[in-house]
């Protein structure tokens, strides 16, 4: 899959990633992505669990999220900005601004353009949705600090243009390359 010697070592060290199409739960995935922005996995999981608890056992509908008082959502541990972003995503579903069937057929760049129109969804979040929700095979997220750190650690590259050039050599499997680079940071041994 990769001619890159660094990635070849990582492929031998870690099990193959299992990317699953999770687009059936697109609202859930977007909300989870927003809550996870700029947080550790543990903190994000805690806040997300508190958020889910507000609605009982079943994940809320966009309408239920819009009906909930902002302060109740804030009490889960979200900033005012994140509460606003969560409501913005819910509103995009209620107003049918998000058409999942259409998004699934769009190019990666068109998906990014469409999703980033929604307050709170930037390029990084859209790229994570492409990789982990829509199972797109060839996404490289230069905006991801973890990926940049892994590239710096494993390749000694700090220049963004050089990182992009390196990632070009991983086409058409850049999503898989990203996954292995993330794993390299999680497991020090």
Which residues does each predicted region cover?
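Alpha-helix N-cap/helix-initiation sites
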Residues: 41-45, 123, 140, 160
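Alpha-helix capping at helix-to-loop junctions
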Residues: 91-99, 117-120, 131, 135, ...
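Catalytic DNA-binding helix-loop module of base-excision-repair DNA glycosylases/AP lyases
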Residues: 35, 107-151
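Residue-identity detector for glycine
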Residues: 56, 77, 120, 143-146, ...
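C-terminal end-helix/capping segment
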Residues: 144-159, 164-168
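N-terminal polyanion-binding entry modules of DNA glycosylases/AP lyases
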Residues: 1-106, 110, 165-189
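Structural signal for membrane-spanning alpha-helices in multi-pass inner-membrane proteins
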Residues: 131, 153, 183-186
